[in-house]
């Protein structure tokens, strides 16, 4: 029975690529919750790194495979205890997939479209969380300008590094790909 279990070199490369994407997501989750959590900040705010990884992987792998990764990663993010994670499941899946579809249809796979999609994803996610807090927890409106917009801008500082890592990881097994 075990003699029929054979994994081709192409399948090994795909397994390696998705394992590295998952490890990059776990690294972002670790940085966001442990290193920058608990009161420690970067330039006065806590960066939101998980959506940066999700967007970069989604744009690199396309709408179908990247969308599956985005859904699983945002679900994992919600299950790990993210505040208002249920909204993040929707936002961090729909916006990167829509960005991947637009980028594949009209734009080249480059850094600037990825940066803009990351900006839109972070802004929509932070705005959704702000609106929930504003309506249900009676949060002051100035919180949006003092905390959430700087959080989006600080999170964008990490996007070039994540983009380069995802681009390098995405080249694993690329010459064997027929798509």
What are these regions (language model features)?
Residues 1-179:
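Terminal, non-globular segments
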């Amino acid at each position: 029975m075990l003699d029929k279990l054979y994994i081709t070199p192409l399948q090994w490369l795909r397994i390696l690529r998705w394992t590295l994407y998952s490890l990059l997501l776990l690294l972002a989750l670790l940085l966001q919750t442990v290193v920058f959590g608990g009161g420690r900040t970067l330039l006065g705010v806590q960066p939101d790194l998980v959506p940066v990884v999700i967007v970069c992987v989604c744009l690199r792998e396309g709408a179908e495979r990247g969308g599956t990764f985005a859904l699983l990663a945002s679900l994992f993010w919600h299950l790990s205890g993210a505040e208002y994670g249920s909204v993040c499941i929707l936002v961090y899946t729909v916006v990167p997939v829509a960005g991947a579809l637009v980028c594949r249809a009209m734009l080249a796979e480059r850094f600037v479209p990825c940066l803009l999609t990351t900006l839109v994803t972070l802004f929509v996610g932070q705005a959704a969380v702000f609106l929930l807090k504003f309506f249900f927890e009676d949060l002051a409106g100035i919180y949006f300008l003092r905390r959430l917009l700087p959080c989006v801008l600080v999170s964008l500082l990490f996007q070039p590094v994540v983009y380069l890592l995802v681009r390098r990881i995405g080249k694993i097994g690329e010459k064997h790909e027929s798509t």
